[in-house]
Amino acid sequence: NQKNGQASSTTGTIYGVYDMSGTVWERTAAYVANGNGNLRGQGASIAYNGNTLKTESTKYTTVYPFNEKDSEGNAITNIDTASQQNFVANSKIYGDAVRETNSGKAGTSEDGWNYSSWTSDYSSFPALGSPFFTRGGNLLNGSSAGVCAFDRNSGGSYYFGGFRAVLVNK
């Protein structure tokens, strides 16, 4: 029924955005520029210009700085620790709904999964072999899926991943 369908959009009309609660982890054009092989293997079209890793954001891609070293300058190999370090390294970045909707240190609970975004949405900052941002969550995340949820991803395909088309007005 079209009338009931319209009620589920953000505007209440057929022109609104549907399914803001998350049914898949939505891929984004955002990553930490840590040089991990998955950036080239899974995201060369957005992360590389020829053989050069893009380390600055563009009109269509958001690039985050990274800090995957411990206090002694050694490379961190634990993804949860690296996730926390990268979250801290990006503490001055606003406008992407990560800091604005997060009340804690993403990805830093004891088991590496954190629910510190608004309404206890899932939050884990990209790091190491999972340098890409995904948003939203899927049905397996239950009430932790939502508009404020974000996660790290390797860039590989999986059954609960998708994307959202975005129209850019020129």
Could you describe each region identified by the protein language model?
Residues 1-21:
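Short, well-ordered junction/capping motifs at the entry into regular secondary structure
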Residues 3-7, 24-33, 52-170:
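C-terminal, surface-exposed recognition/capping segments
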Residues 14-18, 36, 132-133:
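Generic detector of bulky aromatic hydrophobic side chains
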Residues 34-44:
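A short, polar/charged loop-to-alpha-helix boundary motif
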Residues 39, 47-54:
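Eukaryotic nuclear/nucleolar intrinsically disordered, charge-dense low-complexity regions
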